[in-house]
Each structure stands twice: as C-alpha cells, then as structure tokens.
C-alpha cells in the first residue's frame, strides 16, 4: 500500500477519535442520536468525522469534490464494517432532496467554510438550508482568520515557512514574495492566497448566519482546538468570559470556533 494511503488512514483515525470524544457530545445536546438521525457532512474528506455517527446507527452521507478522498472514505468504512454513503461532487452542484424525509437532521461543516471565497459564502448557506429538515441543526467548526495559523501555512513545503505564525496577515504582495522566496510552487501559492481571500473571522461568520436567517443556539471558542489533543497531545482549552466577548481581538487566539445553528 502507498505511503499516502497509510498517512490518510492515520488522519482518518485521528478525525474519528476527535469526533467520538468531542463532536458527538457537542451535538447530542440538540440531536437525539439514539433516534438514528440522518447526518450529512459537507467537505467530508475521508469520512473520519462521520465514523462515530455511523457507529451510533445514524444514516451518514458525505460529500467531497476530491475523488481520492471519497474512494478512501468508502474503503475505510468498508474495513470498519459500517454503512456510509459518499458522493464525489461540488456540493453546490448536488440537487436538493425532493422530500422532507430525504433531508437531514444534522449537517456537519468542519474546517470547510474558511475555504469558500467571499462571494459564495451566502449562497453556500442558502443551499445548505435546502438539505435541512424544518427542525434540523447544523454544526460549523473553523479556525478564526487571525489566529497564528489561520492561513493554513502549515501545509507549506518549506519547514521554516510552515512554522511561521501570522504570516498570512501580511499584504498579498508580501505574502506571495515570502512564499516564492522559500520555494513554494505556484499551485501551493494559489491555494494559500485563495484561503487568504476566503478569510473567516467570527464576526463575519455571524453576519452571514444572521443574513441566512439561521439562529446561533450554541457557540464555543477554543484557545486549544480539541483536535490538537490527538495531533499534538495538548489538552483542549475553552475560552472563558470576558475573552469570548472581545470583538476582533478574539480572532487572534481562537484556534477553532464551534457553532450550532438552528433553522
């Protein structure tokens, strides 16, 4: 088996562990998982976040435009002996369900919204709503834009650049020059600049949510992202008042913002 497959399996297992330890309890206060709800994940990758929901007996559907990830998701679920459906597509091109019964009780969008460029975020939310049952909930998780690695620069080939915090806050011209100087190829630079164009501070997210006529029923800001427990062996740490209430500045120390939205 290719090293890439082994690496993706590790990543799948890490996501499943975080989902099992944190996502399940976070959404279970609003969704009765014992009732086997229908769960949709947009931008599912290899499906690690969905695995614990499938273990609970939920029907799960994952959508992602990366065929390799969808193929891995199908393989990993089959290995686990669990049922999961996966679609390789741009979510915006997936037709909405034709009946209420085919819609979903819970929609997961984790580490996705910060990759959607600005003009398309409102359209994305409106399309998402068409997949939700009248009393459904949506979970969103994303890194606040100004946090140390909010630009995802950790994906850089250069070990030096990948460890530099806050460089995504440079001007686009300065950022491009820095990336070029340290050998990043044009594809990687384009990806990082797209993330810069798609920036998602929490205040802007809530503005889009309000415009979409969705209600925030729960929000949690993390200084130490729960996924860092399995990734870096760090203990997750929630922000506390008054740090959660400081506009703009909170984006600099919020490594992950979690929201539960309701129709």
Predicted regions and their residues:
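Conserved aromatic-histidine-acidic binding/catalytic patches
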Residues: 11, 15, 65, 116, ...
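Short amphipathic alpha-helices and their capping/turn segments at secondary-structure boundaries
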Residues: 98, 126-129
């Amino acid at each position: 088996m290719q090293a890439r497959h082994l690496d993706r399996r590790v990543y799948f297992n890490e996501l499943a562990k975080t989902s099992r330890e944190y996502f399940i309890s976070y959404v279970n206060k609003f969704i009765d998982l014992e009732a086997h709800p229908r769960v949709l994940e947009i931008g599912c990758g290899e499906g690690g976040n969905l695995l614990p929901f499938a273990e609970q007996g939920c029907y799960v559907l994952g959508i992602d435009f990366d065929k390799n990830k969808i193929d891995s998701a199908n393989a990993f679920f089959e290995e686990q002996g669990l049922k999961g459906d996966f679609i390789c597509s741009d979510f915006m091109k997936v037709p909405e369900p034709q009946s209420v019964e085919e819609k979903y009780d819970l929609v997961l969008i984790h580490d996705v919204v910060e990759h959607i460029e600005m003009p398309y975020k409102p359209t994305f939310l409106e399309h998402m709503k068409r997949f939700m049952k009248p009393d459904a909930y949506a979970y969103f998780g994303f890194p606040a834009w100004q946090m140390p690695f909010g630009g995802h620069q950790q994906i850089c080939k250069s070990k030096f650049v990948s460890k530099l915090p806050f460089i995504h806050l440079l001007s686009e011209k300065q950022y491009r020059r820095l990336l070029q100087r340290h050998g990043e190829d044009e594809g990687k630079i384009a990806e990082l600049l797209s993330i810069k164009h798609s920036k998602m501070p929490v205040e802007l997210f809530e503005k889009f949510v309000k415009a979409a006529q969705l209600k925030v029923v729960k929000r949690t800001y993390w200084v130490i992202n729960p996924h860092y427990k399995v990734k870096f062996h760090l203990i997750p740490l929630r922000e506390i008042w008054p740090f959660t209430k400081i506009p703009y500045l909170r984006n600099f120390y919020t490594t992950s913002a979690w929201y539960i939205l309701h129709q």
